[in-house]
Regions:
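Small-residue-rich segments of transmembrane alpha-helices in multi-pass membrane proteins
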Residues: 22-27, 153-168, 215-219, 280-294
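Multi-pass membrane catalytic core of lipid/isoprenoid biosynthesis enzymes
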Residues: 75-114, 213-245, 285, 290
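Intramembrane alpha-helical segments
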Residues: 2, 78-174
Length: 301
């Protein structure tokens, strides 16, 4: 495999989106540590499984959009390997299958190590299979849910509630509904990353019949929705810190708020899709920074 081919596979994996996978796991692990039940092996396996699922979703996204003709050379975002002809559909499908198998194997090992009873084993096995199916069917299949505007809900669920909550539960074996606040906050920040992508590609998606939430809302309301995601996520972190942690260090995440506010103002003011191109990576890093500071604050508490 040539250096160019390797680079194309790396680009197709979209490393700039991987901080989202890391963010949900470190938050769930920090919440478990805050409850004094941290397990580094489970955390590591959760992290690896989630990263593989993110890569699987990215591969499936490119494959599905290519098959449906949604991604063309006119797209504003970076051109993927399949668009440039460096990777053909057959190769990408093979890569997709390999990553799907790796995700299932890693997730299976995680469940075997972490489960305490048959109910947990069955529940997390089902959730693992659903996660793989959801990653693939976002754009692949006869009725991909990404084309129906349901991508944001899926991201909130898998990169927020299940990502954070699952990591927490597998270590503590406890259902603690208070952690829904940081879990939802993490998911909303991840949804903001997807929304930037969809705002940027809104015209191309509309032409291709890809009715993302941004397409349904339109450019103006899509930007209002983006700001709402940022505001509500911040409120969720604040409410959790005030009610459940009650220490100054729990508010470490506010150190990242100036960057978050600057990002929101930029997205609101700049209407040109091309201007949003660097915002996806920026939002992804902001999400990681906020979750990292929130997690550090929990550990110091």
């Amino acid at each position: 495999m040539t250096k160019n081919a390797i680079k194309m596979w790396i680009d197709t994996a979209r490393p700039k989106t991987l901080p989202l996978a890391v963010a949900s796991i470190i938050t769930g692990a920090a919440l478990a540590a805050w409850s004094r039940q941290f397990n580094w092996i489970i955390t590591l396996l959760c992290l690896l499984t989630t990263i593989l699922l993110q890569i699987l979703s990215n591969f499936a996204n490119d494959y599905g959009d290519h098959q449906k003709g949604s991604d063309t050379v006119e797209r504003i975002g970076p051109l993927r390997g399949i668009q440039q002809g460096m990777i053909d559909a057959k190769q990408l499908r093979k890569g997709l299958i390999i990553v799907a198998i790796a995700s299932l194997c890693c997730g299976g090992l995680l469940i075997i190590i972490a489960y305490q009873n048959i109910a947990d084993l069955l529940a997390f096995t089902l959730l693992g299979v659903l996660a793989v199916v959801a990653a693939i069917t976002y754009t692949v299949g006869t009725k991909p849910y990404g084309y129906m505007g349901l991508g944001d809900l899926s991201v909130l669920l898998f990169f927020g509630i299940l990502g954070v909550g699952g990591t927490y539960y597998l270590q503590t074996q406890q259902l603690n509904f208070s952690i829904l606040l940081p879990a939802i906050a993490t998911g909303l920040l991840a949804s903001a990353v997807l929304n930037i992508n969809n705002l940027r590609d809104i015209e191309q998606d509309r032409k291709a019949g890809k009715n993302t939430l941004a397409v349904r809302l339109g450019p103006e309301n899509g930007r209002r929705y983006h700001c709402l995601l940022l505001i509500v996520s911040t409120l969720c972190y604040c409410i959790f810190a005030v009610i459940y942690v009650q220490t100054v260090t729990a508010f470490l995440f506010v150190l990242a708020l100036p960057w978050l506010i600057k990002h929101g103002v930029f997205v609101s003011k700049h209407k040109e899709p091309l201007a949003l191109r660097p915002m996806l990576a920026q939002m992804s890093l902001i999400a990681l920074l906020i979750n990292g500071l929130f997690s550090l604050g929990l550990l110091l508490s």
